[in-house]
């Protein structure tokens, strides 16, 4: 778990794999203790930043304390950024193979994996802080383990393996989630108790 010292922040997730990855990436330098909690949040629609802010404000209302929420997008350049923030629903219905099939008629198979962590100090009326990370890649035929979303069909630029095929130690130093968490961790370390 991220550092036990410092205050606790609720990380809103019911996804054990996501929590495991976040804790592994943050390591022991993160100055707050993350406490995972699953809560029901509305499925907002809109642009990624808008969705993250709305989710974070609603989570802060429900938790009545400091919260972090995460939103992930997978944006296909050939489709103008879709499925974007709706990737969860696409994946649920058509699986990784269907994501690849969506681009069959397009030469451009490039995609952007985007992760946004949103933090609220507990007062939903205060400013929500956003921390973003993105990784460029290609949508490929699924390869590797099928236990973590669309990882089997996203091959980051500069690699021959998909996220699913990469060792966790490698993925967790290049992924969109890593980049967003690094930005968030740096901010918390720098600002300490002022956050």
Curated annotation (Swiss-Prot):
Cofactors required: Mg(2+); Mn(2+)
Catalytic activity line of the entry: ITP + H2O = IMP + diphosphate + H(+); dITP + H2O = dIMP + diphosphate + H(+); XTP + H2O = XMP + diphosphate + H(+); N(6)-hydroxy-dATP + H2O = N(6)-hydroxy-dAMP + diphosphate + H(+)
Main location: cytoplasm
Keyword Nucleus: no
Binding site for ITP: 13-18, 55, 71-72, 88, 148-151, 171, 176-177
Family: Belongs to the HAM1 NTPase family.
Subunit structure: Homodimer.
Summary of the function given for this chain in its UniProt record: Pyrophosphatase that hydrolyzes the non-canonical purine nucleotides inosine triphosphate (ITP), deoxyinosine triphosphate (dITP) as well as 2'-deoxy-N-6-hydroxylaminopurine triphosphate (dHAPTP) and xanthosine 5'-triphosphate (XTP) to their respective monophosphate derivatives. The enzyme does not distinguish between the deoxy- and ribose forms. Probably excludes non-canonical purines from RNA and DNA precursor pools, thus preventing their incorporation into RNA and DNA and avoiding chromosomal lesions.
UniProt protein name: Inosine triphosphate pyrophosphatase
Annotated source species: Xenopus laevis
């Amino acid at each position: 778990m991220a550092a036990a010292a410092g205050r606790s922040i609720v990380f809103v997730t019911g996804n054990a794999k996501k929590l495991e990855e976040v804790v592994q990436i943050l390591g022991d330098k993160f100055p707050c203790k993350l406490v995972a909690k699953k809560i029901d949040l509305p499925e907002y629609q809109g642009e990624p930043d808008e969705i993250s802010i709305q989710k974070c404000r609603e989570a802060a209302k429900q938790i009545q304390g400091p919260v972090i929420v995460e939103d992930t997008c997978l944006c296909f350049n050939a489709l103008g950024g879709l499925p974007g923030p709706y990737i969860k629903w696409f994946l649920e219905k058509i699986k990784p193979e269907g994501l690849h099939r969506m681009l069959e008629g397009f030469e451009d198979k490039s995609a952007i994996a985007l992760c946004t962590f949103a933090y609220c100090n507990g007062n939903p009326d205060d400013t929500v802080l956003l921390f973003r990370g993105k990784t460029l890649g290609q949508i490929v035929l699924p390869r590797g383990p099928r236990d973590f979303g669309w990882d089997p069909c996203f091959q980051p630029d500069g690699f021959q393996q998909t996220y699913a095929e990469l060792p966790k130690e490698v993925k967790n130093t290049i992924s969109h989630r890593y980049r967003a968490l690094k930005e968030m961790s740096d901010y918390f370390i720098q600002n300490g108790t002022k956050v």
